[in-house]
Amino acid sequence: VLNQTLTDFEFLIIDDGSTDRTVEIIQGYTDKRIRLIRKEHQFIQNLNEGLELASGSYIARMDADDIMHTERLRIQLKRMKKNPDITVCGTWAKIFSDKGNERNVSHLGYGIIHEPILELLKYNMILHPSVMIKKEFLLNHHIKYQNYPCVEDYKLWFDIAKAGGILFVEPQELLMFRRSDTQVTVTKKEEMSLGSIRLRKEILLYLLSAYNNK
């Protein structure tokens, strides 16, 4: 993050009860852009606190074990300023693991997601740790992360789309997404699957209601 070509940003780091040397390492940096917040095991609340504490017009999301392309913030900010209607800008990513395996992720669509609610019924095309979000839209529509374990991002995109937000996927690999045996997509696979089913039911009911009210 500190190697970004775009340098004018604040760096909020929310430590969610780490047990390694994370805090010690962060405190070793003297960069004034860094702000460390320590909250133990309050994941959803921590996500929302990050949204509230961020003072900028745009919020870029990132997970601790992934790697950000040095041009990511510059490219996303340029895209969103050039197209001010965009609410959420995700990117393509490259998946890697500690075993050295690597593959591209380019099946997440690209450009503006037309009929976003209908598309979200099919799958979640926005990679959470790759996003940049327009904060003003969230404030104006009172949108925040909800308690949807393992699919809180999926729910957020749905709420944004319902409010008329524009979802966009930048067709560049601006994130290195780490795959490991300890991440949520592996350790809570069943919970994530059930959460996705729950949310798809909610989306389907919304679409049926909208259709019946025409």
Predicted regions and their residues:
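Conserved nucleotide-sugar donor-binding catalytic segment
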Residues: 52, 69, 109-200, 211
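Short aromatic/hydrophobic "clamp" motif used to bind/position activated sugar donors
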Residues: 59
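The conserved acidic donor/metal-binding loop of glycosyltransferases
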Residues: 63-67, 92
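A conserved acidic beta->alpha catalytic loop
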Residues: 15-24, 41, 63
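Acidic helix N-cap motif at the loop->helix transition within catalytic regions
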Residues: 20-28, 67, 71
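Glycine-rich, basic loop-to-helix element that forms the pyrophosphate-binding segment
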Residues: 38-54, 75
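Conserved donor NDP-sugar-binding/catalytic core segment of glycosyltransferases
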Residues: 71-103
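Short, acidic, metal-binding catalytic loop of nucleotide-sugar glycosyltransferases
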Residues: 1-8
